[in-house]
Amino acid sequence: MKKKMLALLLACLCLSLAACAKTEAPAAEEAEQTQSTETAEAPAEETPAAKEPAAADEAPALSGKVTVYMPSPAGLADKLAEAFTTKTGVEVEQFQGTTGEILARLEAEQANPVADVVILASWSDGLSMKADGQLESYTPANADKVNEGWIDEDSMLFGSSASAVGVIYNTTVVPELSADWAELADAQYKDMIAIPDPEKSGACKDFLAGLVTGTADGEAIMQSWADNGLTVPGANKAALEAVTTGEKGILIAGVDYNAYSSMAKGEPLNIYYPASGTVVNPRPAMILKTAPNMDNAKAFVDFLFSDEAQKLVADAYLLPDRSDVQCENRTNLSDIPQITTDWDKMMEVASDTAAKLNSLCK
C-alpha cells in the first residue's frame, strides 16, 4: 500500500514539473524575442567620422622667419615687412640697400646663402640672376592681374612694383623745362645737369641700356651730356639731393617716386617724362633656389600681389604691379611715354653701358 502511495506521489510531482516547464518556455521565448526586437530597433551607436585628409595643395602652416633683401624706399620695405608679419606670424629679416649693394651682398654670401627673397630695382639684373640659375620658378597669387610683361615667361621674375625715370628739375633754378633727352646737351644747360650713378642705381642703369638699344643715337646722347658738364653725385638719393639744394638744376634719369615724395613734402621740384619716351622698370621680386625658408618665401611673394601690399606700393609713389590698381598721387603707367624695350638686349649691355657713362664723366 505504501509503495502504491509513493508511486502516486511521484507521478503527481512529474506532472506538476512538466506543467511548469510548459508555462516558462513561452515566457522565455517571449523575453528572448522582446530583447531581440529591442536590439534591432535601438539606433546603432554612431561611429565617429574619419577625418578627411588635408588637400594635397593646402598651404602649409607658416612659422619662423623669411629673409628679404629690398631696395629703397626704406619706408615701404618696413611697412611691407610689418604687414606680412601681422598677417602670417612670420618674422621678416631685412637687408635694405641699393641694387648694387644687394648684388654685392649676394655674391659675398654665395657659399652660405642667407636670403630667401630678393627684390631689385633693375629688371636686367634680375634677368642676369635667372641666367646664372639662381632663381626658383613659382606662380604667385593674383598673377593673372599683373601688368603685361611684368612676369617673365619662366615665372621667376615678378614685377612687384615699378618706377620710371624722368627729368627732375629745381623750379627755383629752372622755372620751366620740357627738353627731350638730346636737348639737355644744349649750351643753356651747361654744368647744370646731373645723373644718378648707374652702377649703384638699377633704374638709371636700365634706362641707359634702354637708351642705347632702343634709340638710334643713345651713345651719342650720353657723350653730349658728358661734354655739357654732366656730373654723377652718387646713387638716387644723393643725386636728387644735389638738385633739391640747388647745387645742380636738372637731374637726368631721376627715379620718379623720389621726386613725387619730395614734392609732396614741399620741395621746389618738378618732374616730367620726355616725349621721346623713357624706361618703365618693373622691380623684380625673386625667390632664390637656395632659400632656407622656401614656404615662407613663396608666401611673401604671394603677399606682394595682395590688395594690402599694392596699396602700400601706391602710397609710396611707385607704380603698382596690378593692372586693376591705379594711383592718385602720381602719373599712372598708361600716361608715361615709353621707349621700346628689348630686355634681353638691355641685359647684355647694361653693365658695360653704366661703366661707360661713369668713365665719360670723370
Regions found by a protein language model. Give the residues of each.
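Sec-dependent N-terminal signal peptides of Gram-positive bacterial secreted proteins and lipoproteins
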Residues: 2-23
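Bacterial lipoprotein signal-peptidase II cleavage site
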Residues: 18-29, 38-40
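Short, polar/charged alpha-helical segment
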Residues: 48, 53-62, 67-92, 167, ...
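Extracytoplasmic ligand-binding site segments that recognize negatively charged/polar headgroups
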Residues: 67-78, 97-100, 113-248
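A ligand-binding cleft/hinge motif common to bilobed small-molecule-binding domains
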Residues: 124-128, 249-268, 317
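Periplasmic-binding protein-like
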Residues: 148, 163, 223-226, 232-233, ...
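A bilobed periplasmic-binding-protein/Venus flytrap-type ligand-binding module shared by bacterial periplasmic
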Residues: 166-173, 209-212, 281-293, 304, ...
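Mature extracytoplasmic/periplasmic domains
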Residues: 278, 288-341
